[in-house]
């Protein structure tokens, strides 16, 4: 029996469907451990985002600047007909590197369930990471290659007063 044999393909498809069903049931009941996170690069550092807090990942669209806003607020982007505020987290966090540019840069939006039409620029998206396989070290997680990742809670960021205040205050 070869791998191109119809019976073999049906067996592989059945196995795949069973595994997918198990994963979907675990996600629905919460019995599965959520350890997959999205790896992104911001300001030359690597961060891990909870997949439930991350929305779309798109190439950086044209931005419309908004006057009298904080320097880290880059403006508005139209994502599939919805206006999304775009933030430079590197500037917001006071990092040296400026806004992410170049072919690898992406706009990562907050999940719609967060109720905040916002996104941030990532210099690079590193894909899914398995946090359970990493070693905690001084508030960060270190992977098998020795790369340190900082957890980034978008929910906590969305609740931050400074993050919510994109307009310049009088006298600034």
Task: Give a label for each model feature.
Residues 1-172:
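An acidic, low-aromatic, low-complexity terminal/linker signal
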């Amino acid at each position: 029996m070869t791998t191109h044999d119809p019976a073999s393909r049906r067996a592989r498809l059945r196995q795949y469907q069973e595994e997918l069903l198990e994963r979907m049931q675990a996600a629905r009941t919460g019995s599965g451990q959520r350890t997959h996170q999205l790896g992104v690069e911001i300001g030359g550092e690597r961060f891990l985002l909870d997949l439930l807090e991350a929305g779309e990942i798109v190439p950086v669209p044209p931005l419309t600047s908004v006057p009298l806003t904080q320097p880290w607020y880059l403006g508005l982007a139209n994502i599939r007909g919805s206006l999304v505020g775009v933030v430079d987290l590197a500037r917001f966090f006071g990092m040296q590197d400026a806004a992410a540019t170049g072919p690898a840069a992406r706009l990562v939006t907050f999940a719609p369930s967060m109720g905040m039409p916002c996104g941030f620029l990532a210099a690079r998206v590193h894909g899914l990471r398995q946090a359970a396989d990493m070693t905690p070290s001084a508030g960060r997680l270190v992977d098998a290659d020795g790369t340190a990742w900082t957890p980034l809670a978008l929910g906590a960021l969305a609740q931050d007063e400074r993050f919510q205040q994109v307009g310049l205050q009088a006298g600034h």
